[in-house]
């Protein structure tokens, strides 16, 4: 529970809202995995043995992969926005409008 509170405080902006969709996904993924990891440890009597620890590895691996996917998505979105802002100066107005509509439709379909 402490890790969830820490992640929530790290991902909130000044208004107390989650700063981005990817951060929200990461927060939910971490909370879900931490609860399932704790349930896996507390529900099994043999969980403190090496076999119980080995059974918990897929849960931890899933958490790490999910968080890495969220972070990679966040970096890709940031890079695409920066490149889009840089390229606006070199594109005529008509193509600029088409590009803006394309990006808006892309994010609507993506989410």
Curated annotation (Swiss-Prot):
Give the disulfide map. none
Q: How does it sit in the membrane?
A: Multi-pass membrane protein
For this UniProt record, the keywords arranged alphabetically read as follows: Membrane, Transmembrane, Transmembrane helix
Name where it's found.
Answer: Membrane
Report the superkingdom from the record: Eukaryota
Major location category of this protein: membrane
Residue ranges spanning the membrane: these are 22-42, 48-68, 75-95
GO CC term, one of those recorded:
membrane
Q: What else is known?
A: Partially overlaps PGD1.
Q: What is this protein called?
A: Putative uncharacterized protein YGL024W
Species per Swiss-Prot/TrEMBL record: Saccharomyces cerevisiae (strain ATCC 204508 / S288c) (Baker's yeast)
Source species taxonomy: Eukaryota, Fungi, Dikarya, Ascomycota, Saccharomycotina
């Amino acid at each position: 529970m402490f890790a969830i509170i820490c992640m929530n405080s790290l991902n909130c902006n000044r208004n107390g809202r989650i700063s981005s969709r990817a951060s929200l996904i990461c927060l939910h993924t971490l909370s879900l995995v931490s609860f399932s990891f704790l349930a896996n440890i507390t529900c099994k009597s043999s969980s403190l043995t090496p076999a119980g620890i080995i059974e918990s590895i897929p849960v931890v691996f899933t958490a790490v992969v999910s968080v890495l996917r969220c972070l990679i998505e966040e970096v890709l979105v940031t890079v695409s926005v920066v490149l889009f802002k840089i390229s606006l100066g070199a594109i005529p107005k008509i193509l600029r409008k088409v590009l803006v509509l394309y990006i808006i439709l892309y994010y609507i379909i993506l989410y």
